Design a protein with these regions (language model features):
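P-loop NTPase nucleotide-binding/switch module
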Residues: 1-13
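A generic local secondary-structure boundary/capping motif
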Residues: 5-8, 29, 83-87
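Solvent-exposed alpha-helical segments within well-ordered globular domains of core cellular machineries
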Residues: 7, 31-32, 140, 144
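Structured core elements
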Residues: 8-10, 17-19, 39, 96-98, ...
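Glycine-rich phosphate-binding P-loop
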Residues: 12-41
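Conserved nucleotide-sensing/catalytic segment adjacent to the nucleotide-binding pocket
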Residues: 39-98
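Conserved NTP phosphate-binding and transfer environment spanning the P-loop NTPase/kinase superfamily
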Residues: 94-176
């Protein structure tokens, strides 16, 4: 068992850990996801346990379960505000999303061919770094990243499929 700093939500069946520096907008992002129908698993501290060395299960410490700290508001009881569907006791971790200032990302991914991983307890989990900027709807971007991961779990990788179509078009038309 280990702990990680961040927030964890269930986005349409995909367990997502949202992480980032203090003040990066993690909680605002997670609140936006909950408003869209996601379920809170953990806020601030996520406890992970490995299952057979191949998957991670995340949960909240009992003392903070179903609560979030929101700057300027304080501690909120998520299911009391958003309903019982907004909470989840535990969830498998499928995706890690790091919210980062644009200048702190070495190479911002534009196509999706390079696959990053985040390791916890020796298990590597798909990892996406999203640049944070004023006016960006981070909840929407995290939701899209989660749904893209869901597609990948069914064998559909948008970036690889796009590259294959592009290469086929180039070879058929002789475009250099």
């Amino acid at each position: 068992v280990t702990s990680e700093h961040g927030c964890m939500v269930d986005v349409q069946g995909i367990g997502v850990m949202v992480r980032g520096d203090s003040g990066s907008g993690k909680r605002e992002c997670v609140l936006g996801l909950i408003e869209r129908g996601a379920s809170l698993v953990a806020d601030d501290i996520i406890k992970y346990r490995a299952i057979e060395g191949r998957e991670l299960i995340g949960m909240s410490p009992v003392t903070g379960r179903f609560h979030m700290e929101v700057r300027g508001i304080g501690i909120i009881n998520v299911p009391a505000i958003f309903g019982v569907a907004s909470m989840r006791v535990e969830k498998r971790l499928d995706l890690v999303v790091s919210l980062k200032a644009t200048d702190k990302i070495d190479n911002i991914e534009r196509v999706g061919i390079r696959k990053k991983k985040y390791e916890i307890l020796g298990i590597k989990v798909p990892h996406v770094e999203l640049p944070v900027a004023a006016g960006r709807d981070m909840a929407s971007l995290v939701e899209v990243a989660a749904l893209d991961q869901k597609l990948k779990s069914f064998g559909h990788d948008s970036a690889i499929e796009f590259e294959a179509k592009l290469l086929k078009t180039i070879s058929e038309k002789g475009i250099n």
